[in-house]
Amino acid sequence: MTKDELIARLRSLGEQLNRDVSLTGTKEELALRVAELKEELDDTDETAGQDTPLSRENVLTGHENEVGSAQPDTVILDTSELVTVVALVKLHTDALHATRDEPVAFVLPGTAFRVSAGVAAEMTERGLARMQ
C-alpha cells in the first residue's frame, strides 16, 4: 500500500472505532498502526453485543503493572535455541545482540538480533522483522 492508501485506511478504521487516529509517521509506522487498529476492530466485532460478566480474569486489581518473572517455558537457557532476525521497524524488544551474548532493548531498522523461534515467527508474521 502507498502512504496515501494507508492514511485513507487509518481514517476509515478510526471512524469505525469512533476515535481519532494519528495519520503521521513513516510508511512502516502507518502500516503497523493499520494492523493494530484492524486487530482492535476484530476484537470489538467478536465481543459486540455480548455482555461481559465480571470475573476474576477481567477485573482490574491494581497490580497489573507489577513486574513478574518470565514464564518457565519462555526462558531460554541455551543461546543455540535463538534465531537471528533483522528489524524492519524500530523495536523495543527483549533480545540478544546478533553476534554477542549481550542484551538488546532497542533495535533500529536493518539491525540483526536474536530471539526465540516463536518470537521470531510472530515478528515476521506481523511485518516487524524478517528472518536472516
From Swiss-Prot:
GO terms for cellular component: host cell cytoplasm
Cell inner membrane recorded as keyword: no
Location of the region described as Capsid binding in the Swiss-Prot/TrEMBL record: 81-132
Subcellular localization: Host cytoplasm
Keyword Ligase: no
A GO BP annotation: viral genome packaging
Gene: Fi
Primary localization class, coarse: host cell
Listed Pfam families: Packaging_FI (PF14000)
Keyword list, A-Z: Host cytoplasm, Viral genome packaging, Viral release from host cell
Domain of life: Viruses
Subunit structure: Interacts with major capsid protein via c-terminus.
Signal peptide limits: none
Protein name (database record): DNA-packaging protein FI
Described function: Stimulates the interaction of procapsid with the terminase-DNA complex, thereby increasing the overall rate of DNA packaging. Before packaging, it likely coats the surface of the procapsid through binding mediated by C-terminal domain. FI presumably dissociates from the capsid once it inflates upon DNA packaging, and is not present in the mature virion.
